[in-house]
Structure formats: structure tokens, C-alpha cells
Amino acid sequence: MNIELKDSSHGPVYAQVRDQIENGIRTGQLASGETLPAPAALARRLSVDQGEIQRAYFELEHAGMVKKESGTDFLGKPKTTYRMK
């Protein structure tokens, strides 16, 4: 899914990200079980603060649209992933 930000008149960054992901889920562009980009990676790609992406994911999780999973990567470092429900 390609997330694009508009200027600030379209709302805060986290809300734009959240709304685009919600729309992707509703239209079937994002399938159940599909993994979202890591918050840090998406923040870098969009040139925004990572907290904006984390807030969007948090709101999607609490709306029951995304599931947060904790685990470890292949080096044993903690890793969090977000998947579509």
C-alpha cells in the first residue's frame, strides 16, 4: 500500500496515515494477515516523526483493525509487527 501525506490542512500526520490504512482495509487493498511496515521504516519513508506512525498504529489497534505482535528477529532482538486482522 502506498501512503501519501497531504499538507497540514488535511489533518495531522497520524490521522492521515490512520485514515489511509483504514481505507485500504475497507477496500480490500490490505488483506487479513498482511504486515504493515515497521513504524520506524514508514516514518523514514514519509520524513515524519516515528511517534506519528506509532499513534496511527495504536489507534488502528484499539479500533480492532490491526493486531500488534511481539517477538524477536533472527538475531534475538525484540521485534514488534502489526498485521491486519
Predicted regions, residues:
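Extreme N-terminal segment that seeds HTH/winged-HTH DNA-binding domains in transcriptional regulators
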Residues: 1-36, 41, 45-47
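Conserved segment of winged-helix/HTH DNA-binding domains
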Residues: 2, 80-85
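Long, contiguous secondary-structure blocks with strong helical propensity
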Residues: 13-16, 59, 85
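Glycine-centered flexibility sites
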Residues: 28, 33, 64, 71-73
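N-terminal helix-turn-helix
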Residues: 35-68
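Short, Lys/Arg-rich nucleic-acid/phosphate-binding segment
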Residues: 36, 68-82
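Short, structured secondary-structure boundary patches
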Residues: 54-57, 72-75, 85
